[in-house]
């Protein structure tokens, strides 16, 4: 393979402008294939470029949703350098509109890469904090795929294996980035979680995280890491049975009471976050943005995501407040208007 040129300006949440620039570069150099080398952002960018090449007369925004491409992409090879998004095996690409900052997903089987290369050595240089948040992203994929209402025997098995691998290897990879076994196992976990949620989808953790990434540029893995225990707890009894089953399978709990085992499972996730210096809140979320963000999340999740419990925008607004790191400005405003939660 002769690499004609490379596009290296992809941002953490790839924008429609990134896709158009990379597409123009592909055409200018007469390229015949796409090689996505990097994390989820690079792979999503490459997928979206392929979609634009396959459907040159269809704007990217018109591809939002399910099965809007219907054309084969150029050859696409994915080489993940993070163990998190699982984009090397999924049918999704998540893009942010450069003008409106609306973050949306394109879902089409043609977006699944033709080849995925899982090579642990390319992840050795990943900083500890990115190792942590991308790993928790993979955990979110696996858990949301498992607790949803559209699972299969295969997706449940893939989710369980991914969760166990992450519990056993993520903190090792965080502490020692050159541990080949931990890095290899995390790549496998990410891949398995990707195969699971491609068929069983995700849930409200992702819907809220996508809106935060689009509006504020918050890295997707970080948003998922912070939101995961909060959203799981908010599901309440609707998720207890499946979370309890995961707790027992992974050895987190031996309680026969589903509520207790589920709580211990969620607390284990919190402990993992703490051990890897992942914060409990997210900075920069503005109160005035929350209703709009909740509507974005609601539009993304409903009715596509088979979540354990169905929420509307008002319930989703609570999730933003729960992860919000209150600024001095908002603290003053809330003291003047005590009816508004922070």
What function would you assign to each model-found segment?
Residues 139-143, 186-194, 208, 228, ...:
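Short alpha-helical scaffolding segments that buttress acidic/His motifs in well-ordered protein cores
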Residues 200-270:
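C-terminal catalytic subdomain
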Residues 6-16:
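Short beta->alpha junction loops
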Residues 92-200:
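Carboxylate- and glycine-rich phosphate/diphosphate-binding segment that chelates Mg2+/Mn2+
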Residues 1-3:
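Short, small-residue-biased leader/transition segments that mark boundaries at the very start
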Residues 17-24, 28-121:
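Glycine/threonine-rich beta-strand-loop-alpha-helix active-site module
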Residues 243, 253-342:
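C-terminal charged capping/lid subdomain of soluble metabolic enzymes
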């Amino acid at each position: 393979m002769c690499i004609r040129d490379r596009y290296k300006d992809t941002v953490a949440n790839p924008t429609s402008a990134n896709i158009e620039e990379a597409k123009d570069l592909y055409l200018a150099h007469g390229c015949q294939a796409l090689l996505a080398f990097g994390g989820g952002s690079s792979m999503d960018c490459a997928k979206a470029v392929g979609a634009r090449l396959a459907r040159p007369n269809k704007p990217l925004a018109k591809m939002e949703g399910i099965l809007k491409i219907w054309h084969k992409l150029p050859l696409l090879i994915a080489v993940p350098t993070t163990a998190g998004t699982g984009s090397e095996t999924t049918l999704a690409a998540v893009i942010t509109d450069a003008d409106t900052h609306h973050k949306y997903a394109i879902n089409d089987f043609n977006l699944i890469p033709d080849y995925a290369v899982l090579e642990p050595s390319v992840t050795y240089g990943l900083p500890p904090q990115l190792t942590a948040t991308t790993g928790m992203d993979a955990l979110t994929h696996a858990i949301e795929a498992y607790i949803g209402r559209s699972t299969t025997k295969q997706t449940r098995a893939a989710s369980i294996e991914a969760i166990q691998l992450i519990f056993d290897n993520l903190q090792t990879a965080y502490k020692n980035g050159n541990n080949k076994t931990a890095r290899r196992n995390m790549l496998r976990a990410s891949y398995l979680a990707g195969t699971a949620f491609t068929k069983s989808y995700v849930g409200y953790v992702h819907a809220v995280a996508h809106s935060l990434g689009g509006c504020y540029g918050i890295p997707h893995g970080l948003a998922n890491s912070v939101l995961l225990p909060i959203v799981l707890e908010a599901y309440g009894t609707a998720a207890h049975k499946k979370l309890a089953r995961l707790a027992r399978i992974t050895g987190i709990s031996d309680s026969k009471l589903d509520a207790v085992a589920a709580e211990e499972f969620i607390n284990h996730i919190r402990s993992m976050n703490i051990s890897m210096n992942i914060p409990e809140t997210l900075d920069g979320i503005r109160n005035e943005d929350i209703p709009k963000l909740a509507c974005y999340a609601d539009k993304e999740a409903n009715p596509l995501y088979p979540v354990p419990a169905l929420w509307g925008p008002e319930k989703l607004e609570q999730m933003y407040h729960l992860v919000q790191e209150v600024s001095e400005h908002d603290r003053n405003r809330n003291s003047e208007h005590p009816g508004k939660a922070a």
